[in-house]
């Protein structure tokens, strides 16, 4: 019979607590079980050698090995990732993925206090630095002794390839610069993306500009082996761009404003990508409320996503703009206040592609809400869910009533609708006739 790794470790951790070796709290338990797993995880050089051997067979064989190892070593805590709630919702743009992230553990008050009193450490500089491999961790920095990194060459420099410990989707990987240098998007960004896709043609890779919610002080990308709704979305119409007649260019049927470039020659996509990036950075269209900068602060940027489909390389460019107004202090093209009960955080890269990562509080709130709807209780009287009352009023009339059998399905569907609206808020050019005309005005300038 097989025993789950979590069960074995839990037994050892309980014993360690009983003997007074560690304090009984999640932070200290995580630090200790990582130390234990390091004794069983092959050394970095062994992992790299095995990866290289399998890469000779095929890139996929190498990543399959590395992904399984990253879970077997408990670096990716499978038993936590399993707790995430996941469902799909049909939308006008295809099937959208929703997840409520429950795998990042909540810190307990004791550990938070200890972290406050811990003196600031400048090693590793951040959680993406290569020094994390084998690092024992602190109360305010996760232990990474069971973590392994595959060195790769990107744009003629040393980079690292690893998986995200909080797998948001299949084979969610992070590709990061060997040096701790800040992120910036430029022509070289496109070179780096395609260098990686050429190494691992079954993976997509994307850049994460300032607009998302990630570590910006360290140059990195995120990718993986997953086909997002955006990648499945068709092109609404195609265009020809002067001097790039050999590249297929089109507007993607998607709530965010996305241009898709396709060619069998990735160097053409790099050139055209750089041309579009420069053009967008300097582009103002007052009628469409697009301003390249106000008071010297630049607003326009791009989220690029690179992938290979058959023999064809694709580069998706999502146009972003972070301008703020009094009415929308967090951003005009940011989730608007009416949706903040579901999603207040920035729209990160993963969301742009059609996977909502929603806060863990939502699981409990949906459960309480379901109970209140079935029982017909007053939502405004419960402080945990009163923020959802106005939202519930918007869809209550669509259904013949709520029962224990249908209420969760209805709530999941409505959360999906909210997320679609959130994505529409983030789109610079709306999916309306007027929005499309304005989008084409930008394309004309290319």
Residue spans for each PLM region:
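Active-site microenvironments that recognize anionic phosphate/pyrophosphate groups
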Residues: 1-182, 253-255, 270-273, 279-446
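Generic structural signal marking isolated hydrophobic packing positions
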Residues: 177, 220-221
């Amino acid at each position: 019979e097989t025993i789950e790794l979590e069960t074995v470790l839990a037994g050892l951790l309980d014993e360690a607590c009983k003997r007074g070796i560690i304090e009984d709290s999640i932070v200290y338990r995580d630090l200790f079980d990582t130390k234990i797993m390091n004794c069983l995880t092959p050394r970095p050089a062994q992992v790299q050698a095995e990866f290289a051997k399998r890469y000779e067979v095929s890139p996929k064989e190498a990543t399959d090995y590395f992904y399984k190892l990253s879970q077997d070593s408990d670096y990716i805590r499978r038993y936590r990732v399993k707790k995430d709630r996941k469902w799909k919702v049909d939308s006008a743009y295809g099937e959208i993925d929703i997840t409520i992230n429950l795998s990042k553990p909540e810190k307990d008050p004791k550990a938070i206090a200890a972290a406050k009193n811990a003196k600031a450490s400048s090693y590793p500089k951040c959680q993406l630095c290569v020094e994390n491999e084998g690092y024992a961790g602190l109360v305010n920095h996760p232990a990474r002794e069971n973590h392994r990194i595959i060195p790769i060459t990107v744009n003629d420099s040393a980079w690292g390839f690893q998986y995200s410990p909080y797998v948001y989707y299949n084979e969610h990987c992070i590709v990061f610069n060997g040096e701790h240098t800040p992120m910036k998007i430029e022509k070289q960004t496109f070179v780096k993306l395609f260098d990686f896709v050429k190494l691992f043609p079954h993976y997509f890779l994307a850049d994460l500009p300032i607009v998302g919610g990630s570590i910006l002080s360290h140059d990195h990308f995120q990718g993986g082996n997953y086909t997002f709704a955006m990648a499945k979305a068709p092109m609404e119409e195609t265009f020809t761009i002067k001097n790039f007649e050999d590249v297929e260019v089109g507007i993607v049927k998607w709530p965010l404003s996305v241009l898709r470039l396709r060619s069998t020659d990735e160097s053409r996509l790099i050139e055209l990508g750089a041309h579009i990036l420069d053009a967008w950075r300097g582009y103002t269209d007052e009628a469409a409320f697009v301003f390249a900068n106000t008071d010297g602060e630049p607003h326009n940027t791009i989220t690029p996503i690179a992938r290979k489909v058959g023999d064809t390389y694709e580069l998706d460019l999502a146009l972003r703009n972070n301008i703020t107004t009094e009415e929308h202090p967090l951003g005009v093209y940011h989730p608007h206040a009416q949706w903040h009960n579901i999603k207040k955080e920035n729209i990160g890269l993963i969301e742009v592609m059609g996977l909502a990562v929603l806060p863990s509080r939502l699981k409990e709130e949906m459960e309480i809400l379901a109970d209140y709807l079935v029982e017909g209780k007053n939502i405004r009287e419960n402080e945990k869910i009163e923020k959802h009352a106005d939202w519930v009023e918007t869809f209550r009339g669509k259904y013949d009533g709520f029962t224990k059998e249908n209420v969760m399905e209805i709530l999941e569907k409505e959360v999906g609708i909210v997320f679609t609206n959130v994505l529409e808020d983030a789109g610079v050019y709306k999916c309306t006739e007027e929005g499309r005309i304005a989008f084409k005005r930008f394309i004309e300038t290319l």
